[in-house]
Amino acid sequence: MLRSIWVAVALLAVVSAQVRAADADADADKQAFVDQMRALNWVKGPTTVEVQGNSKLTIPDQYVYLDAGNTKKFLELQHNLSDGREVMVAPQNMEWMAYLEFSDEGYVKDNEKIDAPALLKTLQSNTEAGNEERRRRGWNELKLVDWATPPVYNTTTKRLEWATILDSKEGRAVNFSTKILGRRGYTSVIMVTDPANLQAAESNLDHVLTGYSFNAGETYADWRSGDKVAEYGLAALIVGGVAAVAAKKGLFSVIGAFLVASWKFLMIGVVAAVTWVRNLFARKRAG
């Protein structure tokens, strides 16, 4: 009996040591994550930044901005895909984050009718196909549930907008997408937020985007005969632009590349990042 007790005690000691070692490793990983977040070059508003050489964005007070290099690091820290061209803007409380990227695929004609139900099915199929790459990387799969906001095109602002509801192991999030049409292509804006915060976040993003503009000579109205024209219209912008064209041509390597990059942004694995950034700017204000 006594021998059994000592064996049990010894086993408990081993387990306790393993738990302490695991906790120490977790603390070290957390500190490494915080250190990498701290090292990013956070640009605080109010200021105006040049975006990808053809446009400008005014960052309001109480907002922050990351350039392309720092945005790539920020995304990859959270197991989100990046092609290294996106920039990020967000309020300091990190209730939402928006990513901007210009695609020089040509002038997109805006006279196409949008079939929202058909587009939703295509997006759901694309998301499922993209999960193959996420599984290969050891990342959690995504499920596109429904529209949060069906696609709407504003002929005055030349902005196409929609929002989708996505589920993952970490929970539910909303991706709100905007395409701002220009002379030589379009700027994609993807906002990530909690579904409960969507209405307020949309309003805030709309305010921020009033400070975004193409440079002189680069607006949609500046298009001239002879300029490059995209091979697709508004509907294809929603389901992937160049990938939609590739599907018609059988260019499956292009389609595969799109599926790897599609649904880059979901609020997954960002709790620590959001908490740290909030605390960072709170400390700076207090100081």
Regions found by a protein language model. Give the residues of each.
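Conserved polar/disulfide-associated segments of primarily extracytoplasmic proteins
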Residues: 22-56, 70-175, 195, 217, ...
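C-terminal single-pass membrane-anchor helix
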Residues: 231-287
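Sec/Tat signal peptide C-region and signal peptidase I cleavage site
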Residues: 17-21
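Short, solvent-exposed coil/turn segments at beta-strand boundaries
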Residues: 54, 61-62, 94, 180-187
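Extracytoplasmic/lumenal ectodomains and periplasmic regions of secretory and membrane proteins
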Residues: 166-234
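Bacterial N-terminal signal peptides that target proteins for export
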Residues: 1-6
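Short conserved aromatic/hydrophobic patches within beta-strands of well-structured domains
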Residues: 61-67, 211-213
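Bacterial N-terminal signal peptides
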Residues: 7-15
